[in-house]
Amino acid sequence: MKKYNVAILGATGAVGTEFLKLIEERNFPFAELRLLASKRSAGKQIEFMGKTYTVQEATKDSFEGIDIALFAGGSVSKEFAPYAVKTGAVVIDNSSTFRMDPEVPLVVPEVNPEDILKHKGIIANPNCSTIIMVMALKPLYDLARIKRIVVSTYQAVSGAGKEGIDELTEQTKAYSEGREMEAHILPSASLPKHYPIAFNLIPQIDVFLDNLYTKEEMKMINETRKIMHDDEMRITATTVRVPVYRSHSESVNIEFEHDLELKDMAAAINAFPGIQMMDDPANQVYPMPLYTSEKYDCFVGRLRRDESNPNTFNLWVVGDQIRKGAALNTLQIAEVMIKNGWLEK
């Protein structure tokens, strides 16, 4: 198999670290591996597959000779993606910078792989919560068109980075020792006011917009329509940060154009790649973030009719937002391109 020169921008962060784990786990065919980060992280050494790599500071010349550039996310995407594309690399980007650009495909490989072919050098990775939800929606949409979605998310602190994890740990310790819980990170470090996440829920992820939705909520709404190619789908979302380390959970209410049978819905989900049913109420079996972390797949449970509205169903979906919600989805896009010969110049 041909091997490719790969660059990882943001190699020292949570998603960048996950890229490395997955490249090894999935035997991704790389020849050269170039680890890039900010000036602050440059010079750091990373042991990977028996070799020591030195992290380089990202510059406009960092992508010469690179075939695939995996961007872990953040504001640097806007700065460096054009340089990477100019050198001939395909950029697969985890930031929100390009997601709603009509010239940039927004891809979940199991859902809309054909959109990859529309790329002009950049392919966008969706928001983590969007990915987890559309993985559950797509097999059901193939049974009957979806008219309306009401989703509430329960998002882990690792979605806010290592700082979110550290703050939950420290606050839990402080609370157990009778000390005041200090808050500096959530709902967002850039905001003027912060709240403890330990023993708490924060119904704000990202900033509020003029319509009183948060930016995170509007990402889910707009990105889902783009991925599913259905601008008429009505969607409303409430996104909540919860005191869980890893894996996002979502309660999803779905109204269809016509009625479906529960057994057909469960069969469709189980037959769809990357997602599986975990649903046995009699034996208290349902997906939980503690037990689905580090997994490749997303998991669906609590599938049932909404008795208040016809043709409407409820489900609960859980997925690892660092894996399928970020690094795994990105790598899968590259794998689809390699498998189909779409990287050949």
Set out the residue ranges of the language-model regions:
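Charged docking surfaces used in two-component/phosphorelay signaling
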Residues: 69, 157-345
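N-terminal Rossmann-like NAD(P) cofactor-binding subdomain of oxidoreductases
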Residues: 1-192, 232-234, 284-286, 298-299, ...
